């Protein structure tokens, strides 16, 4: 059990680092785009910011799921009836039907993945909300300037 917790904690930590890097990139990119899109209509500007944010976060989540699958492959952990990527995906999004469990004494790895996924998905929701707030604030400034 301790080895499962340590291994799961290590992969979770790496995933948190991936998400932190992606968060930093999103902040940099959205600030540059916000400045470069002053001439666009408000709707197009917000749409561009949100689209880029959601695409970047989706890429981060797929990479994080792939890291879980890679860990399972390296550790020789099998998931009955599915591949490791499908198993990792199901658990990361906390869907975890429960019909497939990790073999070889790694039964805790699924719940650890689910907790990791829930935290990172919640983090993504916070980023999306913050981008929307930032866009709304900038739109308010733009409207004040045009009056």
Short names for language-model regions:
Residues 20-42:
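Membrane-interface helix-loop junction between the first two transmembrane segments
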Residues 137-147:
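Short, highly charged, low-complexity non-transmembrane loops/tails of multi-pass membrane proteins
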Residues 44-62:
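Interfacial helix-start motif at the membrane-water boundary
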Residues 1-11:
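Feature marks short, highly hydrophobic, charge-poor N-terminal signal-anchor/signal peptide-like helices
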Residues 9-15, 19, 83-88, 97-139:
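Pore domain of cation channels
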Residues 19-27, 64-68, 121-125:
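Alpha-helical transmembrane segments of polytopic integral membrane proteins
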Residues 1, 40-47, 99-103:
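Helix-boundary and loop/linker segments of multi-pass membrane transporters
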Residues 59-87:
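Outer-pore turret/helix-boundary of cation channels
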């Amino acid at each position: 059990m301790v080895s499962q917790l340590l291994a799961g904690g290590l992969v979770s930590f790496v995933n948190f680092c991936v998400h932190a890097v992606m968060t930093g990139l999103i902040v940099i990119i959205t600030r540059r785009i916000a400045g470069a899109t002053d001439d666009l209509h408000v709707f197009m500007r917000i749409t561009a910011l949100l689209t880029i944010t959601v695409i970047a976060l989706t890429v981060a989540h797929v990479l994080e799921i792939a890291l879980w699958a890679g860990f399972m492959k390296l550790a020789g952990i099998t998931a009955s009836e599915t591949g490791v990527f499908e198993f990792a995906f199901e658990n990361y999004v906390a869907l975890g039907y429960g019909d497939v469990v990790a073999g070889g004494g790694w039964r805790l790895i699924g719940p650890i993945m689910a907790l990791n996924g829930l935290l990172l998905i919640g983090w993504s929701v916070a980023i999306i909300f913050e981008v929307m707030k930032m866009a709304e604030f900038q739109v308010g400034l733009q409207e004040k300037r045009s009056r």
